[in-house]
Structure formats: structure tokens, C-alpha cells
């Protein structure tokens, strides 16, 4: 999606930047890890296929992607590749039952050293806040689909007041949803400040 191609989002622990071609080799390295692929329901791709995927995500109007940087590492020498720790995505669609404009959210902290430090929580809060603040997206609801064994992600989204709505045993998957209401936006505003800069 072109919406965020010039947007950098600044948090305390993390910085979100658009997914660029220069990020692909490290992303590809992450996705060679079988456990990560299982947790994210991803297929193993060649480096060339990963580059094609990055280009397609940039062009597709229904996908919004940021790379998550460790803010402390980035502050040392502004090396984005060295600071990369994960990514966060939104997939936009109409809810098949209600036709409500919905965004399916994803967060991945790929670097083992970066887990358990609040990076995923802050990155996801920033992504949710950014998306709900963009009037052109016209979102009414967020949802997540999480592997039943991914206790950390289930706990994270329940702490964001997402509620389980569906459980599909055959896919070993749980769906949680969060309507975008004024009360929830107020809660979100208390969790993070949305600070943005122009990204070159």
C-alpha cells in the first residue's frame, strides 16, 4: 500500500518504517526459520520470490506493512538493517458476515534477543493507532488470527481488549476481534503517542 510509503512512526522502544527492497534479504533470512514460518503461517520463499512479495505488498491497496526497528540500536548509527527486529502488517477486507470494513493485524518479532522486551506490544499499538487515525481506510474493526499454541500473541491481543469470536480446530487457529469504538480509541490514546516523521 502506498499510504505509508513516506511515513516513519516513532515509539520509545521501536521505530516503524515502510518495508523497502533493502530490507528483503534480512527478512528472507528470518523466514528461513521453520518455527517462525509455522507461527506466522508463512511459506518458505526464495530470495527472488521474497522481493516479488515486497513489491506486491507495496502496490496492493489492501496491505499495509511496516518493518519494526529497535530504536536503541538504530540510534547508534541509523543502520536500519542492523536495527531490524520484526514486522507488523494489516490486511484490509470486508467482514464476510457483516460487510464491516475490517483490518486483520499481524505482528512478528523475529530476532530472539528482542522478544519479551515490549517491542511487539508497542509496535502493534502504534500500528493500530496509525490505522484507525487514517480516515481513508474507513475501518470499523480489527481482527487477528492466531495459532492456538501461540500463547504470547493470544495474551498480547487480549490485553488490547480483543475478544475471541471463533476457534477453528482443523486449522488450529483462534480469531479475536476488536470493534473500533470511541471508548477503545480513548484507551489506545492513553497507551501510545503517535509521532510521525517523513520517511525518505
From Swiss-Prot:
GO terms for cellular component: cytoplasm; nucleus; spindle pole. GO terms for molecular function: microtubule binding; tubulin N-terminal-methionine acetyltransferase activity. One of its GO terms (biological process) is negative regulation of microtubule depolymerization. The keyword Electron transport does not apply. It is found in: Nucleus; Cytoplasm, Cytoskeleton, Spindle; Cytoplasm, Cytoskeleton, Spindle pole. InterPro entries: Acyl_CoA_acyltransferase (IPR016181), GNAT_dom (IPR000182), NAT9-like (IPR039135). Its EC number is 2.3.1.308. It holds the Pfam family Acetyltransf_3. SUPFAM superfamilies: Acyl-CoA N-acyltransferases (Nat). The keyword Nucleus applies. Residues 34-181 form the N-acetyltransferase domain. N-acetyltransferase that mediates the acetylation of the N-terminal residues of alpha- and beta-tubulin. Required for microtubule stability and inhibition of JNK signaling to promote cell survival during development, possibly acting independently of its N-acetyltransferase activity. Necessary for the stabilization of spindle microtubules and for mitosis progression. Regulates microtubule stability by inhibiting Spastin-mediated depolymerization and promoting Eb1-mediated polymerization. Belongs to the acetyltransferase family. GNAT subfamily. This is Alpha/beta-tubulin-N-acetyltransferase 9. It comes from Drosophila melanogaster.
Amino acid at each position: 500500500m502506498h499510504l505509508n510509503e513516506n511515513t516513519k512512526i516513532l515509539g520509545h522502544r521501536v521505530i516503524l518504517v515502510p518495508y523497502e527492497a533493502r530490507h528483503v534479504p534480512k527478512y528472507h533470512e528470518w523466514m528461513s526459520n521453520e518455527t517462525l514460518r509455522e507461527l506466522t503461517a508463512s511459506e518458505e520463499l526464495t530470495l527472488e520470490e521474497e522481493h516479488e512479495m515486497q513489491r506486491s505488498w507495496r502496490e496492493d491497496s489492501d496491505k499495509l506493512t511496516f518493518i519494526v526497528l529497535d530504536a536503541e540500536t538504530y540510534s547508534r548509527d541509523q543502520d536500519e538493517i542492523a536495527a531490524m527486529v520484526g514486522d507488523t502488517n494489516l490486511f484490509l477486507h470486508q467482514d464476510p458476515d457483516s460487510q464491516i470494513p475490517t483490518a486483520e493485524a499481524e505482528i512478528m518479532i523475529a530476532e530472539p534477543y528482542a522478544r519479551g522486551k515490549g517491542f511487539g506490544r508497542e509496535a502493534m499499538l502504534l500500528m493500530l493507532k496509525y490505522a484507525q487515525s487514517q480516515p481513508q481506510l474507513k475501518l470499523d474493526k480489527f481482527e487477528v488470527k492466531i495459532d492456538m499454541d501461540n500463547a504470547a500473541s493470544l495474551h498480547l491481543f487480549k490485553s488490547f481488549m480483543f475478544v475471541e469470536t471463533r476457534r477453528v480446530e482443523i486449522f488450529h487457529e483462534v480469531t479475536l476481534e476488536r470493534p473500533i469504538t470511541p471508548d477503545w480509541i480513548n484507551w489506545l490514546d492513553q497507551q501510545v503517542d503517535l509521532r510521525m516523521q517523513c520517511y525518505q
